[in-house]
């Protein structure tokens, strides 16, 4: 069994290699100094920092139009990769809502417990984070018309599996101000196969996502290939969870999956119409 430090080192090396093609696309995005400082903070967890070369957090948030005075909603924060950046960045002048996953799933409950322990106990660093819930029957993620930016990272497949993706996107639409932005990152499904409405393998077709968002009332205003990974064939034994960072197969074929890297992901920017 690889120890934790070695695994992080191997994962970091793999992600750096994976990021070569996407880095050029991300490098063209100019990031403000405060956001760069939040990403570079020594207080972030080493395991999260190790993923930065492939996730391009500062560039992605800049692409979505993040600003320090905004009201921002993060959906289903998981372990807090993005919260650890957004919280300090927004603490002084912004407002930050986090819509947690509903209780009842053991894995999600564990993540939520760890998230609460880390982020609600340090108001000086993370500011006042307003907690709400998204799904399966709770969709008031923030006061209607209050948010400048709503963000979801690799969550849409979960809402599809739960049967409430349309309601989740409608909640995002309601929470945003006219002209507000909805940013979506998700594992990109293959276009040569029909979309599983439950997204059981964790992949969602980009065109399917765009159609869902338009059905909710959004207009597509941008897309980015900064998280593209052409090595991801999307036919893995355990779906997207076969690949890093989950590596669901344990030691079996680990080197192969590390060589592939994290999944191929799309980044889409939607806007709530101004009128």
Task: Pin down the residues of each PLM region.
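A short acidic, Gly/Pro-enriched loop at the edge of an enzyme's catalytic core
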Residues: 140-150
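Conserved class I S-adenosyl-L-methionine
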Residues: 68-78
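Helix-to-beta-strand junctions that scaffold the AdoMet/dcAdoMet cofactor pocket
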Residues: 90-91, 159-160, 176-177
């Amino acid at each position: 069994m690889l120890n934790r430090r070695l695994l992080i080192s191997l994962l970091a090396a793999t992600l750096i290699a994976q990021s070569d093609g996407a880095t050029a696309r991300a490098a063209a995005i100019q990031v403000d100094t405060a956001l760069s400082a939040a990403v570079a903070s020594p207080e972030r967890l080493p395991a999260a920092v190790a993923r930065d070369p492939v996730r391009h957090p500062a560039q992605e948030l800049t692409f979505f139009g993040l600003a320090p005075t905004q009201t921002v909603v993060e959906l289903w924060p998981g372990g807090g990769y993005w919260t650890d950046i957004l919280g300090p960045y927004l603490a002084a002048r912004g407002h930050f809502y986090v819509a947690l996953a509903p209780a009842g799933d053991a894995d999600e409950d564990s993540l939520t417990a760890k998230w609460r322990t880390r982020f609600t106990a340090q108001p000086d660093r993370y500011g006042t984070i307003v907690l709400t819930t998204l799904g399966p029957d709770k969709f008031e993620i923030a006061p209607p018309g209050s948010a400048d930016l709503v963000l979801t990272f690799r969550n849409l497949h979960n809402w599809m599996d739960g049967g409430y993706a349309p309601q989740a996107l409608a909640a995002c639409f309601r929470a945003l101000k006219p002209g507000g932005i909805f940013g979506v990152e998700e594992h990109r499904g293959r276009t040569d196969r029909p979309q599983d409405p439950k997204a059981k393998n964790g992949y969602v077709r980009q065109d399917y996502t765009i159609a869902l968002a338009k059905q909710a009332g959004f207009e597509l205003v941008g897309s980015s290939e900064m998280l593209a990974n052409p090595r991801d064939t999307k036919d893995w034994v355990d779906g997207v969870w076969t690949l890093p960072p989950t590596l669901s197969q344990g030691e079996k074929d680990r080197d192969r999956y590390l060589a592939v890297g994290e999944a191929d992901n799309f980044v889409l920017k939607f806007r709530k119409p101004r009128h």
